[in-house]
């Protein structure tokens, strides 16, 4: 069973110790779990809701994720239909190298999406993310969950978006 749990004094060291394979480090763009946790604190302090969560499978920590709720207002998105709108953004998602290839990633991502679909921080039509252009596994996972690439690439990362009501089509991102 997959669970998403808050990070506290009892599990923070375990979150920090999670790691990916050496050949996957380029995919997380040097964004460590500790850095993400610090970013979450900063974002929450600035009034931008951030949820850093530990991923557990049968009471064993297997990964870490973080999503935020903010306005999609980066200059890269100016000509897009979702520009200026509130969205949930997947800030970080990783499964520890010891637990990869067992289907946990998809189950955990589905669990996170189910949480987001409850709109915990406010209304939104969209959830979006970036993934490294060479991360074929991530690309396939996100596509299987309804994410559509927008054609926007920043720092070797591909932007993809999903409409929370399931109605997004290629036309939305053209």
Indicate where each model-derived feature is located:
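Conserved beta-strand-loop-alpha-helix junction that forms the acyl-donor binding cleft
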Residues: 123-139, 155-158
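A cross-taxonomic marker for long C-terminal extensions/tails that follow the last structured domain
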Residues: 163-174
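Short beta-strand element of the conserved SAM-dependent methyltransferase core
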Residues: 55, 160-162
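Conserved acetyl-CoA-binding loop-helix of GNAT-fold acetyltransferases
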Residues: 95, 101-115, 140, 144
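Conserved SAM-binding loop
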Residues: 4, 101, 131
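Conserved active-site alpha-helix within GNAT-family acetyltransferase domains
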Residues: 106, 132-151
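Acetyl-CoA-dependent GNAT
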Residues: 2, 6-98, 111, 115-121, ...
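Short aromatic/hydrophobic contact patches that present stacked aromatics
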Residues: 92-94, 128-130, 161
């Amino acid at each position: 069973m997959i669970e998403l749990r808050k990070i506290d004094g009892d599990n923070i060291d375990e979150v920090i110790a999670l790691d990916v394979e050496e050949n996957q480090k380029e995919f997380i763009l040097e964004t460590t779990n500790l850095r993400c946790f610090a970013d979450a604190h900063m974002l929450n302090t600035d009034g931008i809701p951030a949820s850093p969560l530990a991923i557990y499978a049968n009471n064993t920590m297997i990964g870490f994720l973080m999503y935020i709720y903010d306005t999609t207002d980066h200059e890269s998105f100016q000509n897009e239909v979702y520009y200026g709108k509130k969205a949930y953004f997947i800030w970080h998602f990783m499964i520890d190298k010891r637990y990869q290839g067992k289907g946990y990633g998809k189950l955990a991502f589905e669990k996170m999406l189910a949480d987001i679909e409850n709109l915990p921080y406010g209304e939104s039509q969209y959830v979006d993310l970036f993934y490294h252009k060479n991360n074929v596994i991530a690309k396939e996972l996100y596509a299987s969950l309804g994410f559509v690439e927008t054609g926007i690439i920043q720092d070797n990362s591909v932007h993809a978006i999903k409409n929370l009501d399931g109605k997004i089509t290629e036309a939305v991102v053209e």
